[in-house]
Amino acid sequence: MTELQVGGVTPLTTIDFPGELAAVVFCQGCPWQCRYCQNTHLLPRSLRSQIAWPEVLDLLQRRRGLLDAVVFSGGEPTLQRGLPDAISETRTMGFKIGLHTAGCYPERLDELLPAVDWVGLDFKAMPEDYLALTGARGSGERALESLDYLVESGVPHEIRVTVHDALLPPDRLQRLIDLLADHGAGEVMLQRCRTQHVLDPDLGDNARPWEHAARCSAAQWSNGPQQADGS
């Protein structure tokens, strides 16, 4: 029996898988402690699943014909060993598969990519700046390795960069965009960092992120993906 810790489900979204009507399954647990994380209730690995995976399957069964896709988000979905089986069961029901990931586990991502139709990869900073943001040593290198696996796979994808004035000033952001281009990344979307209810209460206001748009090339602004509501 597939074991997947689920922290919440969004039954319908139009923005988490471009061009598709999708449900989002928020997987519990994340190995990183990103300062601007707003889904802090999804960080602990030890919490019991808020929704049993069979209940999620029942929900998806009832929504066949109404939805095009299911997106596995988090937390960090690749943390969970049950994710491949959950993806297989969902695909068997006729849904396309989307995946939101920060690239924490490159090898696991590489193994999953043949079963995935679209990936939203959160790329947070220049690799050498990751430790100050995630609190995890080697996280930048793992994210870059995941990007390379993703590009090599040919799976359609979007790179999402969260912009905060203090964490990613214009010069660092432009360097990051150039790095992503050098590695063959697809569309790069910038999303404004929202500082309410984040993991680090001392992060401070994000006053003028739109100024970055005028200074940085090859990227667009987006409203960002859904947050988990626990429903």
Summary of predicted features, one role per range:
Residues F26, S73-G74:
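A secondary-structure boundary/capping signal
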Residues L57-R62, L66-A69, T78-L203:
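Conserved AdoMet/S-adenosylmethionine-binding subsite of the radical SAM
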Residues T40-V70:
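Conserved alpha-helical substructure of the radical SAM core
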Residues M1-G19, E152, D165-S231:
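Auxiliary Fe-S-binding modules of radical SAM enzymes
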Residues F17-I51:
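Canonical Radical SAM [4Fe-4S] cluster-binding loop centered on the CxxxCxxC motif
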Residues T13, H41, G74, F123, ...:
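Residues that line or immediately flank small-molecule/substrate-binding pockets and catalytic motifs
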Residues E20, C30, G75-E76, A136:
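Gly/Ser/Thr-rich helix-start
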